[in-house]
Amino acid sequence: GESIVPSGAVAANALGLSTQVPMREMFLTSGPSRKISLGRTEVELRHAPQWQLKEGVAGAALRALLSFGEEYSAETLEQLWERLSESEKKQLVALRGSAPAWLAAAIGRQATRGEEAVVA
């Protein structure tokens, strides 16, 4: 079946990393890009690679960080890290292998900070 998950901007808002509410309803999908109407609301489904379609909090965290781009702040990543459970941190660390190099490196740096390193 087709996978559909919230976009990075929606994930960032849901995780409390952004107060901006996206103007358009956008989701990422394993299917083709398209727009569908649900009543008066138009929803955009944008095709994305499989690694961006991971479900759960760790998948949402990955999409949220990706939405900020390479200009993300270390402070944003620290805020996110504080909100994640140990299990979610491990899941995010495990997902970094499929992320772009800059994001994988940032997650790796965050995971090895502090008193205890988080290892997947």
Annotate each language-model stretch with its function:
Residues 6, 43-45, 53:
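Short hydrophobic-aromatic micro-motifs
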Residues 1-39:
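Short gly/ser-rich loop at a beta-strand->alpha-helix junction or flexible surface loop bordering the NTP-binding
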Residues 36-48:
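A short, charged helix-loop
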